């Protein structure tokens, strides 16, 4: 696919943002802070987040406020980048970000329904994105039950996948959160794959297919690893039932062999030795044991420095910016609990 000249601005801006990312030495400084106020002050004065935190008073900011402001800043960066998208590619950028925001909000509501605290939804939902979302946050904030959630989602692509998880057992009314999450994420990737197929071709299509296929395969690797580790008696078929639909079919015989392994470590070694994902080395497969953030870090680093495609650079930036916020949140929480700086550093994913 020929890249429109205006979209070159997306690639240029993303690479500039990536070049200003928080680096290891700055994370080390953050880990030595003692309070949320000190962390906020350092972020405001010494990192690329100066503009995002321009109106923040570090002395009085709470941890939840800081996190919300960082997410708003990330969203504003998305809005700035998508201005340069062409009419043909805008659907991809929108769906990649906003559909995921919608799914995260729905999952948040399901968690609150399960614990009987739905009134807390309105306190934390991202009002800054409300006008861009297709699901009504006002309607969603009034939900008290799963049936009401389904009613609020009537007419969206999320309704039918969630309908199968409606629980009519009054003695045990808990909703299957893991099942809902899998159904919604399958819906997300199915929609995104269709958009990629009709929007891109050539190198852009190939790189996006590669990055998404690798991401899902590694995410499924995490699911298998954790279930093998914490539920060793689960059958391979039961474990596969919790996995996402693959973007690109992996070597199923290898996966089946790994799932029959006796331990989580044997499972991981089988995937490493059998070349579970083409082009991914042993050290990268090891990221399966480290979680989703390590995978996003791996993919961001792997593609950002070599791609010339605006859409791919955009995906890498969204991976990285989310990972950066997660790192900051982890530091704030760890500092609150008085953890040693060296221990905090081990919790972070750093490129």
Identify the function of each model-found stretch.
Residues 1-351:
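N-terminal domain-start signal
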């Amino acid at each position: 696919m020929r890249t429109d000249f205006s979209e070159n601005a997306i690639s240029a801006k993303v690479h500039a943002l990536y070049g200003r990312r928080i680096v290891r030495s700055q994370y080390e400084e953050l880990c030595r802070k003692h309070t949320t106020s000190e962390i906020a002050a350092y972020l405001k004065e010494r990192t690329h987040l100066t503009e995002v935190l321009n109106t923040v008073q570090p002395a009085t900011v709470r941890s939840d406020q800081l996190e919300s402001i960082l997410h708003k800043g990330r969203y504003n960066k998305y809005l700035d980048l998508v201005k340069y998208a062409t009419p043909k590619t805008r659907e991809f950028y929108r769906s990649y970000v906003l559909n995921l925001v919608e799914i995260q909000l729905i999952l948040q509501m399901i968690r609150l329904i399960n614990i009987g605290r739905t009134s807390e939804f309105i306190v934390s939902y991202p009002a800054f994105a409300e006008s861009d979302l297709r699901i009504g946050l006002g309607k969603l904030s009034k939900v008290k039950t799963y049936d009401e959630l389904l009613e609020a989602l009537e007419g969206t692509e999320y309704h039918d996948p969630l309908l199968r998880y409606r629980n009519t057992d009054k003695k045990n009314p808990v909703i299957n959160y893991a099942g809902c999450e899998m159904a919604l994420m399958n819906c997300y990737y199915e929609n995104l794959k269709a958009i990629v197929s009709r929007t891109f071709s050539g190198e852009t299509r190939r790189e996006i297919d590669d990055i998404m296929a690798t991401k899902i395969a590694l995410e499924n690797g995490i699911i298998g690893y954790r279930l093998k580790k914490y539920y060793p008696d689960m059958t391979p078929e039961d474990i596969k039932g919790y996995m996402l639909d693959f973007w690109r079919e992996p070597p199923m015989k290898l996966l089946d062999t790994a799932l029959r392994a006796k331990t989580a470590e044997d499972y991981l070694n089988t995937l490493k030795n059998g070349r579970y994902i083409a082009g991914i080395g042993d050290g990268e497969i090891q990221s399966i044991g480290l979680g989703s953030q390590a995978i996003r870090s791996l993919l961001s680093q792997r593609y950002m420095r070599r791609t010339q495609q605006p859409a791919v650079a955009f995906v890498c930036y969204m991976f990285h910016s989310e990972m950066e916020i997660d790192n900051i949140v982890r530091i704030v929480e760890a500092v609150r609990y008085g953890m040693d700086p060296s221990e905090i550093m081990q919790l972070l994913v750093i490129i």
